[in-house]
């Protein structure tokens, strides 16, 4: 599934945030605004779909996530995801969403109050067909291709219809139901990547070597080279484009003794292996290869992120979030870095966050969602008007400022005229 957009409302300080995804999408705002809350809101929304009924109840009562801003108190959580998917050789646009009432005190009962699923052929003139329609009083689904969305289905107050329908193998949109229940999101917010390069004989259960959330990078690279050598060579090539002095990457396996899993309890969350892996880098300026852990912080993080992106297709990840990708990266390197990331993407999309003015200069304006407060403490994000992109650049040049510096000066000024540039009404 190729994710196209998400809508989040009633999560921490987020109010009706609609993010439309390009290959790369950037959330740009001042510090302590709510950029990370958007990423957490997406993670929460997709995790809620896959969670058990008991876990859903706990999630609906998480007091750390319930809006406490005075203008948002009592607001329900809403989540919608829009995706493109191919079925029988045709591409369909799918909209799936749900809404629930937070459990704000012990006497309240958490409850899903709305849920819907609709699809259409992704062609001009096509209309959506309703497949799921659920309110607080009833839940219905479309049981046949020729029927209406009127078949009743019994669900628990904290159970989603899209979960219940996983057992309905005979419905004609069963594949879409399966895909919605298995969408994956990966958040990369490790500003210090050093721990990912250390030799480690411990493997967490349930996480394979080729999964995007595996933590032992040398082991991942060893498996990538062994099973997907073309992807391994691609990784080496793009990394060398960013760091031309790197001539080669070398990963070695070392056998060790003492990996006795029989002594571990059955419920231990990890297993021990009899091998460790070390990643080396051959630099044209050095007499011999060095352990990758000796590379700079920026070089280590860039390599880790490129690896995760290449793994995204094997891990069926729809969206990768990267916080502050410019961290420890020189501005000129960042421009090439973003270009390479864009080229590596298949069906996966990237969303990044930043509070750095210079990053704006290296991004396409259409990628950027600008965060602003129309109400104190409430986070909203808006894209540029088509005319606003050019106007912002011209106005910045008049003040002899970069576009990023000028944009952030406006964000810091309570008397700004951002509605001249953004798709919003500041006074609304």
Where in this protein do the model-derived segments appear?
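Short acidic, glycine-rich loop/turn motifs
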Residues: 10, 81-89, 119-121, 281-285
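Short, low-complexity Ser/Thr-rich regulatory SLiMs
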Residues: 100-104, 253, 372-373
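Switch/communication elements of ASCE P-loop NTPase nucleotide-binding domains
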Residues: 1-51, 271-428
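Short glycine-/polar-rich loops that comprise or flank the Walker A/P-loop
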Residues: 77, 181-182, 364-367
């Amino acid at each position: 599934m190729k994710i196209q957009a998400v809508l989040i409302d009633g999560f921490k300080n987020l109010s009706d945030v609609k993010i439309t995804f390009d290959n790369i999408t950037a959330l740009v705002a001042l510090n302590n605004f709510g950029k990370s809350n958007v990423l957490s809101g997406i993670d929460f929304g997709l995790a809620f779909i896959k969670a058990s009924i008991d876990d859903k109840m706990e999630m609906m009562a998480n007091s750390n996530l319930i809006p406490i801003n005075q203008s948002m108190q009592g607001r329900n959580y809403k989540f919608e995801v829009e995706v493109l998917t191919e079925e029988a050789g045709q591409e369909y646009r799918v909209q799936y969403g749900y809404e629930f009432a937070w459990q704000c005190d012990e006497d309240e009962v958490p409850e899903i109050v709305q849920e819907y699923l609709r699809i259409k052929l992704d062609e001009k003139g096509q209309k959506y067909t309703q497949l799921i329609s659920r309110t607080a009083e009833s839940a219905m689904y479309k049981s046949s291709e020729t029927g209406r969305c009127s078949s009743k289905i019994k669900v628990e107050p904290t159970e989603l219809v899209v979960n219940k329908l996983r057992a309905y193998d005979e419905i004609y949109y069963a594949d879409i139901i399966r895909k919605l229940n298995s969408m994956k999101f990966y958040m990369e917010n490790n500003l210090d990547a050093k721990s990912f390069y250390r030799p480690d004989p411990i493997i967490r259960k349930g996480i394979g070597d080729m999964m995007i959330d595996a933590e032992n990078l040398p082991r991942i690279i060893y498996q990538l080279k062994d099973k997907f050598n073309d992807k391994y060579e691609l990784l080496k090539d793009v990394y060398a484009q960013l760091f031309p002095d790197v001539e080669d990457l070398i990963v070695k396996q070392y056998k060790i003794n003492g990996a006795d899993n029989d002594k571990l309890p059955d419920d231990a969350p990890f297993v021990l292996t009899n091998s460790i892996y070390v990643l080396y880098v051959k630099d044209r300026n050095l007499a011999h290869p060095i352990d990758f852990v000796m590379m700079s912080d920026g070089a280590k993080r860039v390599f880790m992120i490129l690896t995760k992106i290449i793994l995204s297709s094997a891990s069926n990840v729809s969206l990768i979030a990267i916080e502050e990708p410019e961290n420890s990266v020189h501005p000129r390197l960042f421009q090439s870095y973003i270009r390479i990331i864009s080229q590596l993407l298949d069906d996966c999309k990237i969303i990044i966050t930043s509070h750095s003015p210079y990053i704006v200069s290296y991004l396409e304006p259409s990628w950027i969602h600008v965060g602003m407060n129309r109400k104190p403490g409430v986070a909203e994000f808006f894209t540029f008007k088509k005319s606003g992109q050019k106007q912002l650049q011209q106005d910045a040049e008049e003040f002899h400022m970069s576009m990023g510096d000028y944009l952030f000066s406006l964000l810091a000024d309570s008397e700004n005229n951002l509605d001249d540039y953004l798709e919003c009404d500041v006074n609304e």
